[in-house]
Amino acid sequence: MYDRSIAIVGSGISGLSAAWHLSGNNKIFLFEKGDRLGGHTHTHVFNTERKPFFVDSGFIVFNKVNYPNFTNWIRELNVRESQSEMSFSVSRAGGDFEWG
């Protein structure tokens, strides 16, 4: 028997985190309008003649100092973390506007 039935709308990081943390003795109903979980976070695959390139979008920044609760959660899930450089650039209007 469950303590409660809980509805969660959206499967972005907040919805997935809420579902995981509340799932103990509760029955969770996760509602997502899209055809996949993850909200804005997604891995895009760009196939080239040589090899595919994988570009992650949506997950803008992660550092242990500013996100201690998130850090603890991914460690509890045994998710590996790796060091990376953070960069951002934009090219629009055929190169008329570029930043980065």
Predicted regions and their residues:
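Glycine-rich FAD pyrophosphate-binding loop
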Residues: 9, 23-48
